[in-house]
A protein has these predicted regions:
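ATP-dependent carboxylate activation and anion-phosphoryl transfer catalytic cores
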Residues: 5-15, 19-29, 33, 47, ...
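A conserved helix-loop-beta module that forms one wall/lid of the active-site cleft
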Residues: 95, 99-160, 167
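Residues within well-ordered alpha-helices
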Residues: 16, 37, 65, 90, ...
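Short amphipathic alpha-helix with an adjacent loop that forms part of the alpha/beta core around
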Residues: 57-70, 144-150
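A short, GP-enriched loop/loop-strand-helix hinge that lies immediately N-terminal to
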Residues: 6-7, 20-58, 68-114, 128-135
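Short acidic/polar active-site loop segments enriched in Thr and Asp
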Residues: 2, 75, 153, 269
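Short small-residue beta-strand/loop micro-motif enriched in glycine and branched aliphatics
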Residues: 130, 165-167, 294-299
């Protein structure tokens, strides 16, 4: 592996570029017309425009990405997260062209990247999972209604081929099912070029706990412990932390060990995250497997000292796990990540625009900021509104909260609105401080008037 094409944008592309350079490999960036002036485009060894702003014409354009790979002589492709990262057809095409797809083998994306088949496989291996359907016919509302009635309301509509909360819509009554189904299908098609949907029984007030794994192609699996991603808005993660606070450590360790055994038994490879729902009464329930790098990987890197992106690249290239990570990792301290979105913090509407000011605290021990933007860049309405990730790492959770709060308060961002006021209010809330957030708990700790004052 000598040259890697980075098939992504924004903070994901910037992070992968840093790992590629650290490994001494050549880098190729691709960009849409809307992203031509983003910093990483200029920092890569080579850069190629792949079309107009809409994702379907650029970052989801499989033919054009493969054409650029052939033209520039890249021998590997890193898909990042989102876009085509869990598209098994694209992974197969990359492999068939003689290139390395830097992720799990396409067969695992086929089986586990598809949320419905992943549940079936994990249930066969003994994991508890809430009620769900298989993939349902897109245009057969009679079948969809029958499936929803069988599960019992409320239900959750979920895309089978994507993640990040995009296209996930709770439905509380039969009357709204049809409209929600059409809306979710359109969102999934636009974001992932895959409109397939299924239904899941809605679980009230769970915590979202996920387990990070690395694996080689020789049957070895390594757990990088867990993350708590319970602070969400509309099923999109806002704040993540590692390790999970205020939880039964024995139960967490037992689940990590059990998942490692399952992944090793089936021969899973390279990188993956197993997402679970957790309630004190019911314990862990399987949710899905993300067959890709996660947005929130940085908090696991902070507490373990493992560079997950470099490890992913080396494992995809065929190295053994023991040569990539030479000693068993342990958790050191506590890390918290906040996702900064270009959105109105009161009404939660997108806030695209030009970054007239983008002043971030300089990196220092205990503080890391990931972004794909700089002052003067335009935050486009065509893509996910995340403009930066801010990661604080300290000896304990209270110190990490203070570090993150201070960093967010020191930022000066003008030209767009951001969710910083909302994040600050969450960090200061009694519920967050107690480690008691659930996936539906964000609204309970947000005061519109207080957010207005902070904004």
């Amino acid at each position: 592996m000598k040259k890697i094409l980075i098939a992504n944008r924004g903070a994901a592309a910037a992070r992968i570029l840093r790992a590629v350079k650290a490994l001494g490999l050549q880098s190729v960036a691709v960009y849409s017309e809307a992203d031509a002036d983003l910093p990483y485009v200029l920092q890569a060894d080579e850069s190629y425009c792949i079309g107009p702003a809409p994702a379907r014409a650029s970052y989801l354009n499989q033919d054009l990405l493969l054409e650029v790979m052939a033209r520039c002589g890249a021998d590997a492709l890193h898909p990042g997260y989102g876009f085509l990262s869990e598209n098994a057809q694209f992974a197969r095409r990359v492999e068939a062209a003689g290139h390395c797809f830097i992720g799990p083998s396409s067969r695992w994306i086929d089986v586990l990247g598809n949320k419905a088949s992943a549940r079936e496989l994990m249930q066969r291996h003994g994991l508890q999972a809430g009620g769900s359907t298989g993939i349902l016919p897109r245009d057969d509302m009679v079948a969809v209604r029958q499936a929803a009635d069988a599960l019992g309301y409320p239900v959750l509509i979920k895309p089978a081929g994507g993640g990040g909360g995009i296209g996930m819509i709770p439905v509380h009554d039969p009357q709204s099912l049809s409209d929600c189904w059409k809306r979710a299908s359109g969102m999934a098609e636009k974001a992932f070029a895959n409109a397939a949907l299924y239904l899941e029984r809605f679980v009230p007030s769970p915590r979202h706990i996920e387990f990070q794994f690395l694996a080689d192609r020789f049957g070895n699996v390594l757990s990088l412990f867990e993350r708590d991603c319970s602070t969400q808005r509309r099923y999109q993660k806002v704040i993540e932390e590692a390790p999970a606070p205020a939880i039964d450590r024995q139960a967490v360790a037992g689940m990590a060990e059990r998942l490692s055994a399952i992944l090793g038994k089936i021969g899973y490879d390279v990188i993956g995250t197993v997402e679970m729902l957790y309630t004190p009464d019911s314990g862990f329930s399987f949710l899905e497997v993300n067959t890709r790098l996660q947005v929130e990987h940085a908090i696991s890197e902070a507490v373990t000292g493992v560079d997950i992106v470099q490890a992913q690249i080396r494992l995809a290239a065929g190295e053994k796990l023991s040569s990539v990570i030479d000693r068993p990792p342990a958790v050191a301290g506590h890390a918290i990540e906040a996702r900064l979105y270009a959105e109105d913090p009161v009404r939660f509407l997108p806030s695209p625009g030009v970054l007239k000011a983008f002043e971030l605290p300089p990196p220092r021990p205990g503080l890391r900021i990931e972004t794909g933007y700089a002052r003067g860049n335009r935050v486009s309405s065509h893509y996910d509104p995340m403009v930066a990730k801010v990661i604080a790492h300290a000896d304990d959770r209270a110190a990490a909260i203070r570090e993150l709060t201070g960093a967010l308060g020191a930022m000066r961002i003008e030209g767009i609105k951001t969710n910083i006021p909302m994040i600050l209010q969450v960090l200061a809330s009694e519920r967050f401080q107690a480690g008691a957030m659930t996936v539906d708990g964000l609204q309970a700790v947000i005061s519109t008037e207080s957010v207005k004052e902070l904004a």
